[in-house]
Regions:
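Amphipathic, alpha-helical segments enriched in basic
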Residues: 21, 25, 29, 89, ...
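Extracytoplasmic loops and strand-loop junctions of Gram-negative outer membrane beta-barrel proteins
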Residues: 28-34, 92-100, 167-168
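Short sequence motifs at beta-strands and strand-loop junctions characteristic
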Residues: 38-43, 100-107, 163
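C-terminal beta-signal and adjacent terminal beta-strands/loops
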Residues: 59-92, 105-109, 115-169
């Protein structure tokens, strides 16, 4: 009646650019072959899937026959981003470390599905289900400010430039 599947994926998505335009400013500089993590690099992915089924003929209430519960948990390591210092007033930034050398936080999601199959005749039936995505209502961090690594603070007010602006208000 119960099935548990678990898998782990380790991948290294390294390259010279995450999309077709990543290196367009460097086309006149010869063949540069520096590899770095691509924007969509997810080093670690862990999937757990639990499935429980009630079958006909078991000692269960009739309404549970051909019903089931499926729970899926997914955890993924954070994607890379390029960390930089707080932007200067005249524009530009200063990269800290390498391109895509910093990582966003891990994400974690649990999804659930309850279903019931109603059989009409041999080979014909209807599967009714209720699916809940993000069962725990977790707010995963998908993007961060490159100067702070925070999803909510861009770092401007804490910078010297930001403090000067506050004093001159």
């Amino acid at each position: 009646n119960a099935t548990l599947n678990a898998n782990y994926t380790l991948q290294f998505a390294d390259g010279t650019g995450s999309d077709a335009n990543s290196q367009r400013g460097l086309t006149s500089r010869g063949n540069l072959r520096t590899l770095f993590p691509l924007n969509y690099d997810e080093r670690h992915r862990i999937n757990l899937n639990f499935d429980y089924r009630f079958f006909k003929g078991q000692a269960i209430p009739k309404f549970l026959e051909d019903a089931g519960l499926n729970v899926q948990a997914v955890s993924v390591s954070g994607r890379p981003y390029t960390a930089d210092r707080t932007p200067l007033e005249l524009g530009g930034t200063q990269t800290i470390g390498s391109i895509n050398g910093a990582r966003k936080p891990w994400t974690f999601t649990i999804n659930a599905r309850i279903d019931k199959t109603i059989n009409f005749s041999k080979g014909a039936g209807l599967n009714i289900y209720c699916r809940v995505s993000n069962l725990l209502n977790r707010q995963n961090v998908l993007n961060v400010y490159s100067a702070t690594g925070s999803p909510t603070d861009d770092g401007f007010l804490a910078s010297a430039n930001g403090q000067d602006k506050l004093r001159n208000i």
